Structures are given as structure tokens and as C-alpha cells.
């Protein structure tokens, strides 16, 4: 039986050996055996220890064949198990166990034949392979085997003892794990510390293989250490895990995660973080802070006061602002303002200084001489002298006699235009609105004594500017005085204009055909004005005339010719033309046209000329008879076209080289005017705001520029302490849509003088509800504007007493309230009038008398001495004995 078992076990061993050889495990055994022998030779372990350990190792094998076979299988399995482990793990002491001698000396001859043995199935082969390649034993099983080997120690056999190589590990360094709080950080890490400079890494990191091999612990060794009983010396003491040693020894060189992996620092190194550290005031206080990046503190450079010296001499052009003057003088504007304020002048930086005296005085205060630069002004001003000065400076050989310019002046309705019509044999007076002249006319008429240029001026008080302009341009003034009325206000004004211009005066006493004509009255009035007539031994020529009968007209012409001969009126026709604008207007077909009077030189067709703020190139030139002219000699009035804009009446003109030069001059002038207008903006009138003045806003449109001037002058002369007049816009031509829209936006009134409304603007007037007033006579326009100004004022309320009644009894009514039984003591109580409730001579309330009854009948009024029932509107607190005064409110319009 035993022999059969042995045979079976032997067969299994042989089969396993064949499988091992087939799998190539025999070569692995040889390599392991050679490695073990080399380690045994190099190891310093003593032979006694080797024998003792080998005896302990072989004690577990039994003498019987099955036990030897199991031991061989076990050793083989261990060698295979060592291969399965990671090659990067720490090596264990390897042991080599030799097979028993009986098994090693077996040969294939002793094996049974193939025929006698039954073939193994696949399942049996798989089972045998599983037995041969066993899984490693658990640590508990290894421990039990070691205990059994120690207990059943047997003497060593004569077999070759295996050599065991052991590895002594250094003692592990015990590291104390710091305790962390709920935040996951140590308490010392939460305190403010001074930071140290990070250590520079000089050594490169170890390869991943070495790190893994060193740090990976032996699971089997650790588990064996836990199961090994204390007091046994069978195995050397195990050291601490590799990863703990690594973290303990190389803590400074290894990179860790958050602060909790850092080593605990001593309290001596902990430094409180203060506000000085935040602002970098503790820099360099310790060596640890040397690594910190020093803040670059910008050192405050002491501002050196650069004493800028004011220049001793500058050259400026006027007007100039305070700011610009300070810049030119290299000073602060505040210094100039302070100096001006000290001398009683209040200015701000944007105010304009246009006085040469003020500018130069301020310069002297700072030690600077200021010179006024007038080069630009000289460039824009083509000529400096007047026409008369230019004629006086001209070579006498070039001068020729010219026609006299005669201006007819006088009071309104004294017959100036009628007298001119009689001289010209025309009928201009019939076409004038209101039978008064409202435009200035200039024309040349031929008389038996020669040609005379006549200027017809308006006589109304509104046209004083026209009269002044006529007095400046004319040579002789014919003062027309009505013999039946004498000298009036505008006559006196005309005399003053003539005296101011030092012009010869000839007095024409008109309307000599009337029965109440009295020339002596006119002589006396002239003498009172220091104009002594020739009849009284003076030098003033007086002529009695009648425009209707023609009496005295020839004498008047002869007198004018005599005066012109005495004056020796001459001009230079070869010079460039200079003159004055008599009137200008906007023609629908021709555009801007102007009536000009040539005073010196000759004006030719196609020449370029410059006015104050516009220029032009003459396209057409007509006389008063609408005849086309090629040239105009001195003392000739002509109507010219081709202007860039409408010139103002009274503007002088002069001929320039070409249109390009004229355009450049006007562009420079307009730029200067715009700059001056921007600098000299009117400050808001705070007095009007404080006085709560009302303002009438107007937009004026007229047929000619002179009419606008006259109307604006008349409107602005309306004096009122309660209403101010502001002219928003004025222009020549018909009233357009833009004028209506501007009036609607600004709540203004449109005034049209001798003009009309464009057809497409009439519907806009109704839709926007704009007030438009059209006039043909100037004094009608002025009167209408006064009425509009008066309508802006709130009427004055006046209370007029009507009667009084005393309350004798009171009656309560649930529907009507309190009814007062009264006795009328004075006057009349009238229904629906105002009532005062008076008690102890004090007015308690004012209300309306809503109901008045007499004997249960509604009456309109109750007279004195009668009783009545009165119901007051919204008042129920009157008592017996109170007095009810009835009154009415009368509104009176205010006066300007």
C-alpha cells in the first residue's frame, strides 16, 4: 500500500518536473541558486549562525518522501513567488533548499513506460500546474510554520546546508505627527510669520524608479513584524516604513503640499506681523527679511521754486483776455486778478481787457512795458484817412469839380418830399405809405444851374440815424421849415447834425401859399438856435418856397449853385472808388442790392469792393431811372448788385484789386468779430431777475436795412421799469418759415415792416399759434409794441366797497347750512359779489355772497335799511354782531 503511494507521488513529482522544464522554470532555479551562492560567499554572516539558521529552516521537513516532496514544492513555489513580486521592491533574505538525495538521483529509467501510464487529461494538467505554482502564503501561515520549525527542531542532515542572506536595516527615526485643528492647519501656521527665502534646489530630483524602490514598503515584512512575538531573535528588527523615513530625513529637500506638511517651527522664529511690515517700514531689520523685494519708494523731490521773471517788454493785440495776458507776461492769472482787484477792477480769467490804458498800467505794476500790436488791424483797415482827407492830400492837378450833394432835412409833414418832387418834376410823395418818407432816397437831377445830387431823409423821430448819415455825406443841408408851424423837434435835431458835421445850411421856409404863413416867427426861432438869417443881418440864407405853386424853386436852385461854387467841391476821378452805402435791401430776383454814393474816384462795372462785413463784385449798376451804367463818377448814386451779403446802411466801401483779396479781408474780419463776440458775451442781468421784470421778445423783418435800424432804435428807446424788450433776430426780406419756428420756440412776437409773409409760412402761423404784426408806418409799429408790452404786465386790482350789513340772527339748515339774518346798514348788498366778515374791526374771512333773499324771494340787491337773508359761500362760523362788507374788484392796467 505504501509502495503504491510512493509510486503515485513519484509519478506526480516526475510529471511536475517535466512541466517545470517545459515552462522554463529549471533555468530560473539555477539562476536563483547561483545568486544565493554568490550572496553567501560575500555575506559576513558567521558559519555558526548559518548552520543554526539552516537547521531551523530544514527542521520543518520530514524524513518521509511525501514530506520531502512537499518541501521541494514549497521551496520551488517560493522562488516563483519572489519573481512575481515587483522588481522595485526591497529584497528579502533569500533561502535555497536542496532537494532530497533520493529524489535528485532518480533517473528516467526508473519511470514506468509510456504504455503503462495513463495519459493525463487537460484538467489534471491544469491542476498540476496550479499545485506547482502556488500563491504566496499569508503572513499568519508563515508565522505558524516558523513556530512549528522552532518547536520541532531536528538535527541537521548530512545534506548541503542552505545559506541564508539577511539585510540589516537601520533604526527607524520616530516622527511625531503634528496635531491639526478643524481648519486642517497647525496653530503655528495660522499665526503671522515672517517668510523665509525659498531654498534653491541644487540637486535634481531622483528618478522615479529609485524613489519608488526606496519609498515602497515591504508589505510582507511589515506584516511579519506585527505577528512576530517579542523576545525571539529569529529575525532582525524591522525598521520604520520607508515613506516615514523619507519624510523625516529629507523634509527640507522634498516639496510638500499645504502648510500642514511643513515641520513645526519653534516659537523663537515666529515674528508678529505689524502695520510697519505692511508698509515695508521694517525692511532690513533682520537677516530673514533680506530676501524680500524692497519697495521702490519714490523720494519726494523737493519742488524747487523756479522764479520766472516777467519779461520787460511784450507786444500784444487788443482785445485780450486776462488769461492770455497772464500767459504773455509769464504770470499766473490769479496774480493779475489780485492786482486788478486791488485797484478796484473786478475781473475773472475769461473777462476781456479792451482798454489800452488798463493793460499798460497793469504791465507797469509788474515792471513790464506792454506795446499794443495794431499790425493786424492795419491790415484789415485798408485806409485810415477819410474821403475828405484823401481829397485834400491829392495832387490839385488831378482834381475836377463835382456835383454838390444836397440833403433835405426837416420835421415830418413839412413838405420835404413834395419840394423834391417839384424840383425833379416827379411824384414820389404819392407812393409813400402814410404820406411820410420812411426810406432814404438818393438821386441825381438836372437843373438849369447844373446837376445836383439830392438826398431825401425821413422826418420821423425814429430815423435820426438816417438823418445823421445824410448830414455826414452831404455838402449842403436844406432845412425845410413849414411857415405855418415853425421849427419843431426834428428840425432842431437836423440843425444839430448839420452843426456837428460843419455843413452849410440853407433854410427853405415852405408852404408860403398858406394864409397863416409867418416868416418872422421862423426868423425868431432860427435866431434862438444861433442861426441868424440874412434878413436880420446874418449869414444864413432863407428862401420862401411853395411846392404846390412852384414859388421860390428857381431861387433855391440858384442859391444851391452859389453855395457849391463857394465851397469849391472837387474830387479825383482817377483814384480808386470810395463811397458810402445809402440803403440796402434783399431783392427777390437780384438778391442783395445796395444804393451807394460815390464820393471819390470812379466806380466801374466788374470791380471788386469791400464793405465792413461783406464784399462783392459788381454785376450790374443802374441809376435812379433804372438805366444800366458802365461807370459812376463822383457824387453819383447808383444801385449795384453782386454782393455776398446785405451791407448795413452807412457802411463805407472801397475798391480792391480783385475778388480773392476782398474775400480774404472779409474772412479775417469776420473771424475777429466772432472772437470778440465770444469773448464779450453779455453777462446775465441779475437785476432784472431780482426785480422780476417781464421781457418782450421780438423778431423784426423789414424791406431795407435802414428800416430795421430805425425800427430797432425806436423800440429800444421805449423806457420801462417793468418790461424789457429783447430783439432776438432782425433781417431784410419777407417773413419765412424759419422766423415762425424761431418765434414759436422762443415765444416771441414777429414784427414786419414794409414786408409780407411767405405763402408757405401762413399755415405754419396758425398751427404754431404765433403772433405776427405787419406795419407800413413806423409810429404805428411803435405804438403796437407799447400795447404788447403793457399787456404783459399784471393788472392792478382795486377793491370798491358797495355796502355793509350787520348779522342780527342765525338759522341752521340741514341742506343749506347757516343762514344769516342781516340788516343793511350802509350802501347796497349785491348778490355774487365779494364779502368781508369783520369782527372787532378785524377781517376774519373773505368769500362770495352766494344767495340773497328778501321776504322769501331771491333778489339781486338789497338797499340800506332793509332786512335780508344772506347765505355765504363755504363759511359757517359767522356770529351775531359780525359785519358783512360787500365789495367788488376792479382791475386797472399798469402803465409802462
UniProtKB/Swiss-Prot annotation:
Which organism does this record belong to?
Chlamydia muridarum (strain MoPn / Nigg)
**Where are the stretches annotated G1?**
410-417
Bias class Polar residues marks the residues at 35-48, 114-126, 213-237
Q: Where is it predominantly found? A: cytoplasm
Q: Which domain of life is it from?
A: Bacteria
Q: Tell me the gene name.
A: infB
Q: Where is this region: G3?
A: 456-459
Q: Which Gene3D superfamilies match?
A: P-loop containing nucleotide triphosphate hydrolases, Translation factors, Translation initiation factor IF- 2, domain 3
Protein name in the entry: Translation initiation factor IF-2
Amino acid at each position: 500500500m505504501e509502495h503504491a503511494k510512493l509510486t503515485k507521488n513519484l509519478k506526480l513529482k516526475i510529471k511536475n518536473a517535466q512541466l517545470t522544464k517545459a515552462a522554463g522554470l529549471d533555468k530560473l532555479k539555477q539562476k536563483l541558486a547561483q545568486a544565493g551562492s554568490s550572496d553567501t560567499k560575500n555575506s559576513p554572516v558567521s558559519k555558526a549562525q548559518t548552520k543554526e539558521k539552516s537547521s531551523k529552516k530544514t527542521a520543518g521537513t520530514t524524513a518521509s518522501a511525501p514530506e520531502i516532496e512537499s518541501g521541494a514544492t514549497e521551496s520551488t513555489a517560493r522562488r516563483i513567488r519572489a519573481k512575481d513580486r515587483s522588481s522595485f521592491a526591497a529584497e528579502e533574505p533569500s533561502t535555497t533548499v536542496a532537494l532530497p538525495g533520493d529524489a535528485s538521483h532518480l533517473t528516467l529509467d526508473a519511470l514506468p513506460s509510456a504504455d503503462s501510464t495513463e495519459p493525463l487529461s487537460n484538467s489534471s494538467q491544469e491542476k498540476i500546474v496550479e499545485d506547482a505554482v502556488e500563491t504566496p502564503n499569508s503572513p499568519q501561515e508563515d508565522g505558524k510554520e516558523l513556530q512549528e520549525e522552532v518547536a520541532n527542531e531536528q538535527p541537521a542532515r548530512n545534506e548541503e546546508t542552505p545559506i541564508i542572506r539577511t539585510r540589516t536595516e537601520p533604526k527607524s527615526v520616530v516622527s511625531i505627527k503634528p496635531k491639526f485643528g478643524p481648519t486642517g492647519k497647525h496653530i503655528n501656521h495660522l499665526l503671522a510669520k515672517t517668510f523665509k527665502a525659498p531654498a534653491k534646489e541644487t540637486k535634481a530630483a531622483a528618478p522615479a524608479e529609485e524613489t519608488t524602490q526606496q519609498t515602497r514598503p515591504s508589505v510582507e515584512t511589515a506584516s511579519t513584524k506585527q505577528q512576530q512575538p517579542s523576545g525571539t531573535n529569529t529575525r532582525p528588527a524591522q525598521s520604520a516604513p520607508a515613506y516615514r523615513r523619507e519624510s523625516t530625513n529629507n523634509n527640507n529637500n522634498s516639496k510638500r503640499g499645504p502648510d500642514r506638511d511643513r515641520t513645526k517651527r519653534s516659537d523663537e522664529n515666529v515674528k508678529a506681523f505689524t502695520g510697519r511690515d505692511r508698509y515695508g517700514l521694517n525692511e532690513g531689520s533682520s537677516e530673514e527679511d533680506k530676501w524680500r523685494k524692497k519697495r521702490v519708494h519714490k523720494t519726494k523731490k523737493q519742488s524747487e521754486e523756479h522764479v520766472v521773471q516777467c519779461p520787460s517788454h511784450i507786444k500784444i493785440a487788443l482785445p485780450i483776455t486776462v488769461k492770455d495776458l497772464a500767459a504773455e507776461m509769464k504770470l499766473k492769472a490769479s496774480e493779475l486778478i489780485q492786482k486788478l482787484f486791488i485797484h478796484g477792477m473786478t475781473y475773472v480769467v475769461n473777462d476781456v481787457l479792451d482798454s489800452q490804458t488798463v493793460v499798460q498800467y497793469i504791465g507797469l505794476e509788474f515792471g513790464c512795458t506792454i506795446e499794443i500790436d495794431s499790425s493786424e488791424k492795419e491790415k484789415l483797415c485798408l485806409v485810415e484817412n477819410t474821403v475828405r482827407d484823401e481829397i485834400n492830400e491829392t495832387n490839385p492837378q488831378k482834381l475836377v469839380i463835382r456835383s454838390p450833394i444836397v440833403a433835405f432835412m426837416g420835421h415830418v409833414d413839412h413838405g420835404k418830399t413834395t419840394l423834391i418832387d417839384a424840383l425833379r418834376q416827379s411824384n414820389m410823395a404819392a407812393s409813400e405809405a402814410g404820406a411820410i418818407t420812411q426810406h432814404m432816397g438818393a438821386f441825381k437831377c438836372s437843373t438849369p444851374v447844373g446837376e445836383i445830387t439830392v438826398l431825401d431823409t425821413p422826418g420821423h423821430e425814429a430815423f435820426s440815424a438816417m438823418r445823421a448819415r445824410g448830414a455826414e455825406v452831404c455838402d449842403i443841408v436844406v432845412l425845410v421849415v413849414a411857415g405855418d408851424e415853425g421849427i419843431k423837434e426834428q428840425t432842431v435835431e437836423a440843425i444839430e447834425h448839420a452843426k456837428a458835421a460843419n455843413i452849410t445850411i440853407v433854410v427853405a421856409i415852405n408852404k408860403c401859399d398858406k394864409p397863416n404863413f409867418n416868416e418872422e416867427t421862423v426868423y425868431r426861432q432860427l435866431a434862438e438856435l444861433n442861426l441868424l438869417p440874412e434878413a436880420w443881418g446874418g449869414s444864413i440864407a432863407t428862401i420862401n418856397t411853395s411846392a404846390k405853386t412852384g414859388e421860390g424853386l428857381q431861387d433855391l436852385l440858384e442859391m444851391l449853385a452859389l453855395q457849391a461854387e463857394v465851397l469849391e467841391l472837387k474830387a479825383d476821378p482817377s483814384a480808386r472808388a470810395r463811397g458810402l452805402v445809402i440803403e440796402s435791401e434783399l431783392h427777390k430776383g437780384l438778391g442783395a442790392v445796395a444804393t451807394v454814393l460815390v464820393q471819390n474816384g470812379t466806380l466801374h462795372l466788374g470791380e471788386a469792393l469791400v464793405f465792413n462785413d461783406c464784399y462783392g463784385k459788381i454785376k450790374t449798376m443802374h441809376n435812379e431811372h433804372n438805366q444800366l451804367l458802365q461807370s459812376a463818377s463822383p457824387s453819383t448814386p447808383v444801385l449795384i448788385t453782386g454782393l455776398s451779403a446785405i451791407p448795413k446802411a452807412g457802411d463805407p466801401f472801397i475798391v480792391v484789386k480783385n475778388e480773392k483779396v476782398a474775400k480774404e479781408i472779409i474772412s479775417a474780419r469776420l473771424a475777429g468779430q466772432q472772437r470778440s463776440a465770444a469773448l464779450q458775451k453779455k453777462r446775465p442781468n441779475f437785476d432784472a431777475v431780482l426785480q422780476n421784470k417781464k421781457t418782450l421778445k421780438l423778431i423784426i423783418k423789414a424791406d431795407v436795412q435802414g428800416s430795421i435800424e430805425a425800427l430797432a432804435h425806436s423800440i429800444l428807446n421805449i423806457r420801462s421799469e417793468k418790461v424789457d424788450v429783447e430783439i432776438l433776430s432782425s433781417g431784410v426780406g419777407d417773413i419765412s418759415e424759419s422766423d415762425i419756428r424761431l418765434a414759436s420756440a422762443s415765444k416771441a412776437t414777429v414784427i414786419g415792416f414794409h414786408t409780407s409773409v411767405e405763402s408757405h409760412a401762413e399755415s405754419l402761423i396758425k398751427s404754431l399759434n404765433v403772433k405776427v404784426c405787419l406795419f407800413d408806418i413806423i409810429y404805428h409799429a411803435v405804438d403796437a409794441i407799447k400795447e404788447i408790452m403793457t399787456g404783459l404786465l399784471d393788472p392792478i386790482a382795486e377793491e370798491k366797497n358797495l355796502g355793509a350789513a350787520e348779522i342780527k340772527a342765525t338759522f341752521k339748515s340741514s341742506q343749506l347750512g347757516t343762514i344769516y339774518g342781516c340788516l343793511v346798514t350802509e350802501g347796497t348788498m349785491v348778490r355774487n359779489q365779494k364779502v368781508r366778515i369783520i369782527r372787532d374791526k378785524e377781517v376774519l374771512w373773505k368769500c362770495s355772497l352766494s344767495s340773497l333773499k328778501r321776504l322769501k324771494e331771491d333778489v339781486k340787491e338789497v338797499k340800506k335799511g332793509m332786512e335780508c337773508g344772506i347765505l355765504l359761500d363755504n363759511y359757517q362760523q359767522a356770529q351775531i354782531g359780525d359785519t358783512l362788507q360787500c365789495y367788488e374788484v376792479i382791475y386797472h392796467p399798469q402803465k409802462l
